Amino acid sequence: MAEHNEFGKEGEEEAAAYLIDKGYSIRHRNWHCGKKELDIVAEYRNELIVIEVKTRKNTRFGNPEDAVTDKKIRRIIASTDAYLRKFSVDLPVRFDIITLVGEKTPFTIEHIEEAFYPPIW
């Protein structure tokens, strides 16, 4: 596995541990359906939380959350729709971003709740 993939996986591990520590129940990690993918799907206070995880070694080229572009948001929304249909989930949905910055653990973690809303097409 490429070094950047290992680094990203380490960040996702830390993000999941952070969420569990905060009382979230992890439903799925790296959920795939065809080309659709969600980093973390969790439940918290009767909501389904879809979390996009971004890990960076530093912020020299911008903040990690800036990598969640409109195109990426559309993919996350489409993936969430597939997830809701597959598992017949009937909960309100919230979209969060967790950023992790640092060379290795402990990372600096930022949890951005309600980071974006589904666009109206």
Curated annotation (Swiss-Prot):
MF-aspect GO terms: nucleic acid binding
Protein name per its UniProtKB record: UPF0102 protein BVU_1879
Residues annotated as signal peptide: none
Family per similarity comment: Belongs to the UPF0102 family.
Pfam families in the record: UPF0102
Organism lineage: Bacteria, Pseudomonadati, Bacteroidota, Bacteroidia, Bacteroidales
Superkingdom to which the source organism belongs: Bacteria
HAMAP family linked to this entry: UPF0102
